[in-house]
């Protein structure tokens, strides 16, 4: 395998979503992680009783951790959470004590990659959203 091919295989795209039924309330995350070949890993995970922003950060953290386990070099993340996207890009400061440790951990992991994060409308994040809602309904973990 050529080095260029190996580098292409280490490029991942993630769609992430966190959801809470009530805020705080029963919460779950959904992550769709896709490699450069188009293969997808879908993660649906119950995270207990949280608020929506904690759930959104938990979804991003799961994507970062999974991408690093897969030896990703590049990770492009798409999220419908303006708070998470704007805090991760530095447009907003993270002043919330309940979000700060998640934000800090995500920033630290993101520095290990060529990382970018983009805001998308909710209707363009439906697969991750369905996985998050499934986790809340079933209170389970699935990869």
Protein language model features and the residues they cover:
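RNase H catalytic domain
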Residues: 19-23, 61-141
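Active-site beta-loop-alpha junctions of metal-dependent nucleic acid enzymes
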Residues: 49-56, 95-99
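Short amphipathic alpha-helical segments, especially helix-boundary/capping motifs
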Residues: 7, 33-41, 58, 79-83, ...
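A generic short-segment signal for beta-strand/edge and adjacent turn/coil regions
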Residues: 1-3, 44-47, 85-88
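RNase H-like nuclease fold core
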Residues: 5-54, 65-69, 73
């Amino acid at each position: 395998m050529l080095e260029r091919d190996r580098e292409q295989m280490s490029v991942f795209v993630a769609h992430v979503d966190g959801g809470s039924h009530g805020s705080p309330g029963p919460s779950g995350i959904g992550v769709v992680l896709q490699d450069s070949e188009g293969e997808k890993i879908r993660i649906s995970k119950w995270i207990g009783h949280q608020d929506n922003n904690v759930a959104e950060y938990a979804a991003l953290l799961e994507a970062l951790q999974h991408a690093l386990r897969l030896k990703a070099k590049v990770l492009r993340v798409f999220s419908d959470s303006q708070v998470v996207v704007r805090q991760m890009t530095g447009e907003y400061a993270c002043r919330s004590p309940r979000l700060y440790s998640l934000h800090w951990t995500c920033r630290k992991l993101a520095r290990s990659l060529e990382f970018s994060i983009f805001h998308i409308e909710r209707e363009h994040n439906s697969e991750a959203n369905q996985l998050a809602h499934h986790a809340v309904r079933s209170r389970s973990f699935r990869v």
